Each structure stands twice: as C-alpha cells, then as structure tokens.
Amino acid sequence: MAAFRDMEEVSQGLLSLLGANRAEAQQRRLLGRHEQKVERLLETQDGAEKWLREILTTEKEVAQRLLDAKEQAHQGGVEVRQLEAELQRASEEDAHLKANLLQLTRELEELKEIEADLERQEKEVDEDTTVTIPSAVYVAQLYRRISKIEWDYECEPGMIKGIHHGPSVAQPIHLDSTQLSKKFISDYLWNLVDTEW
C-alpha cells in the first residue's frame, strides 16, 4: 500500500514537471488515467483486506466450532465408554445374581427333598414306635423268658456275647460268628435252653 502512495507522489511530481512541455495535455490525460487506476487498485486492495479480515474471522469461528464439536464428540465418546463399562458391570452382576439364584434354587430343592425324606423317616419312626418296636420288645422279652439269655448288645461286630442264666449257675456266652457256622451257633444256644418248663 505504501508503494502505491509513492507511485502517486511520483506521478504528481511528473505532472508538474511535464506541465511546461507541449505534450503536457496528453501526459496529464495519461497521468489522470494512471491515477484512476491507482485509486481503483487502492480501493480494491482495501476491499480485499476487508474481505480477508472477514474470512479470517469466519475461519476462526468455524475452527472454534469444530474444536467445540470435537470436544463434545470426545465427551460423548467418554460417556459412551462409561455407559458401556456400567452396562458390562451390570451384566456381570446380573450373571452373578442369576448363578446365585440357581444355586439357591438347587439348595431349596435339596432341602425340600431332605424335608420329604425326614417326613418319611418320621412316619417310619412313628410306625416303629407304635407298631414295630412294641412288638419287637414283646418278642425280645418272650425270647429272654424262654431262653434266659441276657444279650450284650454293645459287643464288637461279629461277636455274640451275653449271659445265660441257667437253673443252677449263670454262664457267659462268647462266640465268634466269623469262625463258627450259623448252625453251630444256633444249636449251641438252643442246647442252653432248659426243656423243663
């Protein structure tokens, strides 16, 4: 812009110098046109500078909007990742709760089976105490009166122990069922029973 002003000053100087000359009128016309072109050029330059400032301002605004949009997109991405992580945690917790529920359901079924088994056993015990045990006690007492043998029910497995209360003396019984036959044991015990009533 300074260069154009210098050119204008030079043009003015030339006009004054050429004024004495015959071609002065022609030169003035040429210089006038030159001045008009320089003025148009300066106006165009001013307009271009104004447009350039407007373009720069617009570019800054667009750049700021773009940065804002990127920031919002980034924040949105962070929120999406957070939501995905929360969803993953919730899914894992849901799976854990379902597994616990399944385990508790199995345990409940097992407890129901145990309860049913206990009820069945209770009925059997009731039946034993009302029917089987009294009759077994009666039979055991009857055998004791007949055989006069007092059994040792706390002896080791495979051993037969007790005391036979014979007519004159009490005699201990000590038999090993793993080494003696059932027939021998039966015959031995029946031989202890007194045939006289």
Curated annotation (Swiss-Prot):
Q: Which residues carry this modification: Phosphoserine?
A: S11
Claim: Protease is one of the keywords in the record: no
Protein's cellular compartments: Nucleus; Chromosome, Centromere, Kinetochore
Protein name (Swiss-Prot/TrEMBL): Kinetochore protein Spc24
Region Interaction with the NDC80-CDCA1 subcomplex, residue ranges: 1-69
Q: Which GO terms describe its cellular component?
A: Ndc80 complex; nucleus
Family that this chain belongs to: Belongs to the SPC24 family.
Q: How does it assemble?
A: Component of the NDC80 complex, which consists of NDC80/HEC1, CDCA1, SPBC24 and SPBC25. The NDC80 complex is formed by two subcomplexes composed of NDC80/HEC1-CDCA1 and SPBC24-SPBC25. Each subcomplex is formed by parallel interactions through the coiled-coil domains of individual subunits. Formation of a tetrameric complex is mediated by interactions between the C-terminal regions of both subunits of the NDC80/HEC1-CDCA1 subcomplex and the N-terminal regions of both subunits of the SPBC24-SPBC25 complex.
The record's listing under PANTHER family reads: KINETOCHORE PROTEIN SPC24, PTHR22142
Pfam families in UniProt: Spc24
Q: Where is this region: Interaction with the C-terminus of SPBC25?
A: 132-197
Q: Which UniProt keywords apply?
A: Cell cycle, Cell division, Centromere, Chromosome, Coiled coil, Kinetochore, Mitosis, Nucleus, Phosphoprotein
User: Could you tell me the Gene Ontology terms of the biological process aspect for this record?
Assistant: cell division; chromosome segregation
Would you say which domain of life the source belongs to? Eukaryota
* Protein's job: Acts as a component of the essential kinetochore-associated NDC80 complex, which is required for chromosome segregation and spindle checkpoint activity. Required for kinetochore integrity and the organization of stable microtubule binding sites in the outer plate of the kinetochore. The NDC80 complex synergistically enhances the affinity of the SKA1 complex for microtubules and may allow the NDC80 complex to track depolymerizing microtubules.
Checking InterPro entries in the record gives: Ndc80_Spc24
Q: Has the keyword Nucleus been applied to this entry?
A: yes
Q: Which residues form a coiled coil?
A: 21-131
Cystine crosslinks = none
Give me the ranges of the annotated region Interaction with the N-terminus of SPBC25. 1-131
